[in-house]
């Protein structure tokens, strides 16, 4: 079976709050072959404790919530087989999926608030 490339455009935003906060995306687009592991990177900067979120927007559909980290276990399981790992020392919250599907082609949004 031939593998089709999966394109994902990662976009980032911050939820407004009183303190300085930001998210950064080192890659504008991620391309993986179907069946390969997928990682969409997100790093953040906050002055307090972070609340981190991932959202997805599939073609011709509205924004959908995938997962969030507020406190507790650093590995967060989300919808559609996605998970994200909170790493405080590296200030990262990378979205991962062990085996990407063509249907995963979408816009992915990382968000932070403190």
Swiss-Prot record:
Disulfide-linked positions: 42-110
Q: Where is the Ig-like domain?
A: 21-114
Q: Which organism is it from?
A: Homo sapiens
Please tell me where this protein is predominantly located: membrane
- A Pfam family matched by this chain, by name? V-set
Compartments, record wording: Cell membrane
Q: Which GO terms describe its cellular component?
A: T cell receptor complex
Output the superkingdom of the source species.
Eukaryota
Among Gene3D superfamilies, the record links this protein to: Immunoglobulins (2.60.40.10)
Phylogenetic lineage: Eukaryota, Metazoa, Chordata, Craniata, Vertebrata
Oligomeric state and interaction partners are given as: Alpha-beta TR is a heterodimer composed of an alpha and beta chain; disulfide-linked. The alpha-beta TR is associated with the transmembrane signaling CD3 coreceptor proteins to form the TR-CD3 (TcR or TCR). The assembly of alpha-beta TR heterodimers with CD3 occurs in the endoplasmic reticulum where a single alpha-beta TR heterodimer associates with one CD3D-CD3E heterodimer, one CD3G-CD3E heterodimer and one CD247 homodimer forming a stable octameric structure. CD3D-CD3E and CD3G-CD3E heterodimers preferentially associate with TR alpha and TR beta chains, respectively.
The UniProt keywords, alphabetically, are: Adaptive immunity, Cell membrane, Disulfide bond, Glycoprotein, Immunity, Immunoglobulin domain, Membrane, Receptor, Signal, T cell receptor
- What are the glycosylated positions? 87
Matching entries from PROSITE patterns are given as: IG_LIKE (PS50835)
- Role of this protein: V region of the variable domain of T cell receptor (TR) alpha chain that participates in the antigen recognition. Alpha-beta T cell receptors are antigen specific receptors which are essential to the immune response and are present on the cell surface of T lymphocytes. Recognize peptide-major histocompatibility (MH) (pMH) complexes that are displayed by antigen presenting cells (APC), a prerequisite for efficient T cell adaptive immunity against pathogens.
Question: What range does the record give for the signal peptide?
Answer: 1-20
Q: What is this protein called?
A: T cell receptor alpha variable 3
Any single biological process term in GO: adaptive immune response
- InterPro entries the UniProt entry points to: Ig-like_dom (IPR007110), Ig-like_dom_sf (IPR036179), Ig-like_fold (IPR013783), Ig_V-set (IPR013106), TCR_variable_region (IPR051287)
């Amino acid at each position: 079976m031939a593998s089709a490339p999966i394109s994902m455009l990662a976009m980032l935003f911050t939820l407004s709050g009183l303190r300085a906060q930001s998210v950064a995306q080192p890659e504008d687009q991620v391309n993986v072959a179907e069946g390969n592991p997928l990682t969409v990177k997100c790093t953040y900067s906050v002055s307090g404790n972070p609340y981190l979120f991932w959202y997805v927007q599939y073609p011709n559909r509205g924004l959908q919530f995938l997962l969030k980290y507020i406190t507790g276990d650093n590995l967060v399981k989300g919808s559609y087989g996605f998970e994200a790992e909170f790493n405080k020392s590296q200030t990262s919250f990378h979205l991962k999926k062990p085996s990407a599907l063509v249907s995963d082609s979408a816009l992915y949004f990382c968000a932070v608030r403190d």
